[in-house]
Each structure stands twice: as structure tokens, then as C-alpha cells.
Regions:
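DNA major-groove recognition helix of helix-turn-helix/homeodomain DNA-binding modules
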Residues: 48-66
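A short, Lys/Arg-rich alpha-helix, primarily the initiator
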Residues: 1-16, 102-106
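The alpha-helix within a helix-turn-helix
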Residues: 14, 25, 54
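Residues within the helices of the helix-turn-helix
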Residues: 11, 22, 51
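C-terminal regulatory/oligomerization modules of transcriptional regulators
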Residues: 85, 92-119
Length: 119
């Protein structure tokens, strides 16, 4: 089965930290089949596991910043819990927008700049 973007990020992180799937699964207390399922998308990715995986790699000196977003895409689900009405409307608007991929890319870059600058 092909890897999801989440799976690609996790696999790259394992390679970058010289960690095998088996080593990671043992340290996290799960089977390698479970982790493989998260990488391939055959299993939904619980928020708890995103945090656990981020912490796992952080302890090895590697920060994974977009992992929750990649998990949301892999799960085909974005929670609106805790978002304001205007944020929820914005998410819904983007989900059904007629914007081109180039326009969406430009908006994503703008949002990234806003978030990184704290403006």
C-alpha cells in the first residue's frame, strides 16, 4: 500500500534519525503493524499518536511541525472543535472553494507567513 503524506513525513523522520519501524514501535509500546497502518493510511491517526510521534522524534533532536495537518489530510477529517464561528466558516469556504491550486498555494504561503510572524 502507498504511503500517505503523513506516512512519508514519518518515514523520512525515521530515516533522518536512523530509527527503524521496529525500534520506534517498541519504544512507543505498539506493534510495527500499527505504525505501518498509520503510515499507509489503513488506520486513522488519533491526535494522541500525532503528539506521541512528535515527542518521539523531538527526543531525537528532530521537530516535525506540520504533522497534525498531515494527519488531518490522511484521515480526511479536520475538527472544528474550539474554532470560532469565523474560523469555521473559513474552513468550510476553503473546502468547497473554486480556487485554483496556484491560488490555494499563494493563500497557504500567506497564512504560513502570518503564523510565523505572529501578525
Amino acid at each position: 500500500m502507498a504511503l500517505t503524506e503523513f506516512g512519508k513525513a514519518v518515514r523520512k523522520a525515521r530515516i533522518d534519525t536512523d530509527c527503524t519501524l521496529l525500534t520506534m514501535s517498541k519504544e512507543l509500546g505498539v506493534t510495527s503493524a500499527f505504525l505501518s497502518g498509520l503510515e499507509t493510511g489503513s488506520k486513522k491517526i488519533p491526535k494522541k499518536w500525532v503528539k506521541d510521534i512528535q515527542d518521539f522524534f523531538k527526543s531525537r533532536g528532530l521537530e516535525l511541525y506540520d504533522l497534525q495537518q498531515l494527519a488531518d489530510v490522511s484521515n480526511e477529517y479536520v475538527s472544528l472543535d474550539g474554532l470560532s464561528q469565523s474560523q469555521q466558516m473559513l474552513v468550510a469556504g476553503f473546502a468547497k472553494s473554486p480556487l485554483t491550486p496556484e491560488q490555494l498555494k499563494r493563500i497557504a504561503e500567506l497564512m504560513k507567513n502570518i503564523n510565523s510572524n505572529g501578525d
